[in-house]
Amino acid sequence: AYSNLNYLRF
């Protein structure tokens, strides 16, 4: 699972 900050980066 990806963190909230991870998906905002891509």
UniProtKB/Swiss-Prot annotation:
Keywords annotated in UniProt: Amidation, Neuropeptide, Secreted
Organism the protein comes from: Penaeus monodon
Statement: the UniProt record of this protein carries the keyword Ribosomal protein: no
Claim: Secreted is one of the keywords in the record: yes
Localization terms from the record: Secreted
Family: Belongs to the FARP (FMRFamide related peptide) family.
Modified residues (Phenylalanine amide): F10
UniProt-recorded name of the protein: FMRFamide-like neuropeptide FLP2
Gene Ontology CC: extracellular region
